[in-house]
Amino acid sequence: MSFPSLQEQLDIITANTVEIISSAELEQKIQHSIKTGAPLKVKLGADPSRPDLHLGHSVVLRKLREFQDLGHEAILIIGDFTAMIGDPSGKSKTRPQLSAEEARENGASYFEQASKILDPHKTTICYNADWLGNMTFADVIRLSSHYTVARMLERDDFERRYRSSEPISIHEFLYPLAQAMDSVHLRNDVELGGTDQKFNLLVGRDLQREYGILPQVCITMPLLVGTGGEDKMSKSLGNAVCFNDLPSDMYGRVLSIPDTLIENWCRLLLPLTGEGRRAILEGWEEDPRTAKRRLAREIVMQYYSAGEAGAAEEHFDRLFVHKQAPTEIELTRFSEPELPLVDLLTTLGAAASKTDARRMIQQNAVSIDEEKITDVKTIITLSDEPKTLKAGKRKFFRIATAGNS
């Protein structure tokens, strides 16, 4: 198999990266790959702690796709076993553990979602429970002997918790070792991860060396800042744009980012080559509004068709530029003629909880037939005549009693 030249590959592989450990070893591995015609084995792990992937995950997935396009082997690890431990990276307290059923259920759609970026025909997918689940307690003891508590406490998050007398469970020490066993089992050449995964990646590198395997090169990628412009993207923080969001929701959420994120999102989320990326980078400072609209369109097109991206833009303009309600809103009918507004919002899925519903009402984010409602104790009276409920900027519902159609 023939590969692009060393420099061509390095230009693509090193773009947007934070750290490569080590660059010299990466060059050696690429040169050996070119000489032998054997592709590099490039690994990316994802613990299915939640069922949805978001744009933050796409940063490392896109780097894995770049390796694919260069002719290398992409290995996507679904960490169904390690998810039952819980990754402590960046956490100030112990993360809740998932059951085996929850981990498998969440992981079931990961490959389908990741395939919106990866070439599914050139991707090897593995579940680490297939090998970690077969380890005996004696195997775990032997594995633990390869690493010391002192080394574990070099992690910033562990050190902070230790200094502040916050509890650290033994199973959290086992997490990086379990993830490192993935690298031992697969004998991969390269591992990708966000900057918060650096310690885990290095443990994999060390453990490969302990087992007599040529150590992997570790490549870390930036953590994508969420839509609010401050914290890293996280669904739990409510600042995420998910792969499975509706095109109109995805478009609107991208447009909600502060102008200061346009360049960063463009560099991290769009392919290295392409007219859209180039146009955004050249013009965002002079005309951020136009650049952001193009960015939103380009991002939606990665997960949906160009036609759906165009329809999402038209939907946004109709709602927020021309101030028109959506032309088609599904009608939901209720058997009760009167319902507390808080219950109505949670039942419709407009609010994640009653607390969230009260917050929305108090922040003037809820209206019925264009009339703002600010009293959290409001009771809504329904009839056969549908009412239009608006929650937040983009959620519309038509509601009525379960009478005549």
From Swiss-Prot:
Keywords, ordered alphabetically: Aminoacyl-tRNA synthetase, ATP-binding, Cytoplasm, Ligase, Nucleotide-binding, Protein biosynthesis, RNA-binding
Subcellular localization: Cytoplasm
Residues the record lists as binding ATP: K235
PROSITE patterns: S4 (PS50889)
Pfam hit, one: tRNA-synt_1b
S4 RNA-binding domain mapped to chain residues: 339-400
Gene name of the encoded protein: tyrS
Protein name as it appears in the record: Tyrosine--tRNA ligase
GO cellular component: a single term: cytosol
Gene Ontology biological-process entries: tyrosyl-tRNA aminoacylation
HAMAP family assigned: Tyr_tRNA_synth_type2 (MF_02007)
Molecular function terms, GO-annotated: ATP binding; RNA binding; tyrosine-tRNA ligase activity
InterPro entries per UniProt: aa-tRNA-synth_Ic, Rossmann-like_a/b/a_fold, S4_RNA-bd_sf, SYY-like_C, Tyr-tRNA-ligase, Tyr-tRNA-ligase_bac-type, Tyr-tRNA-ligase_bac_2
